[in-house]
Amino acid sequence: MGFTHRIRVRYADCDMQGVVFNPVYFTYVDDAMDQWLASVLEGDYLQQDFDYMVKKASIEWDSPARHRDVVELRPEVTRWGRSSFDVRMHMSVGDRTIGVAECVFISIKPGEHETPTPVPVPEKVRAALG
């Protein structure tokens, strides 16, 4: 089994309905991506001449996560392009699927956040993420 990132739902993550507020799931996905990259690239990937940005993201929701639930996020690369890659992020609480995020990321030069220029995804990143 691949990488799994676990996040305990905080009170502040929930809306008036008592469930995780929709945009918070994107924060969970972002945190899982950061942790996944840090684990497979063994440290600060920005110091390894790699950075990335979200080009597109969507979530198909299935069921709610609530305060104190532990959300498990399991990423997998589903497509490689020259300077981009797609990731599917499975989200669950226990055996219950709560949703699936689909994201397109672009590889950029570290430090070019104002006017990012897409650059080829480094081979070490491709190898590490599979």
Model-based region annotation:
Residues 36-72, 76-84, 98-100, 106:
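Hydrophobic beta-strand-centered segment that forms part of the acyl-chain substrate-binding groove
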Residues 7-9, 59, 75, 89:
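Preference for bulky hydrophobic residues occupying beta-strand positions
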Residues 1-55, 110-130:
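Hot-dog-fold acyl-thioester-processing enzymes
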Residues 3, 66-67, 78-130:
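HotDog/MaoC-like acyl-thioester-processing domains
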